[in-house]
Amino acid sequence: MDNIVLGTKGKRLGRKALREKIEALGQSFGLEIEPEKKVYDMSVSEKQTVEILKVLYRGAQILILDEPTAVLTPQETERLFKILRRMREQGCAIIIITHKLNEVLSISDRVTILRKGKSIETVETAGCDEKKLTEL
């Protein structure tokens, strides 16, 4: 719980109210965690969940993820994608930086190809496959 609210400004809530707020926020996005669990006792996936809850707690509307699945199992990746889809449905903009084309196609609406720091092309993923993306 402290990991989520540390550094926030404004009115401080009591621990019970804070716990309830974090649990409600987590439930609305499918981010179930144990608020009192210590970070050193968490899996990589749980730590990632805490980081996402942190930005949501602060009211962020844009989430930027750099290689978010690099150390996740396939099950953890699918869980993360479910969370991201729910966030998108609730109005969050999500930017994912990755080299995993199959994941790009499964989670995104559109993709921008970058080479040497320059934007090459942006395409809708609905009509794309991995081969087309590599040819851009």
Task: Please place each PLM-identified region on the residue numbering.
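Glycine-rich phosphate-binding loops of nucleotide-dependent enzymes
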Residues: 1-136
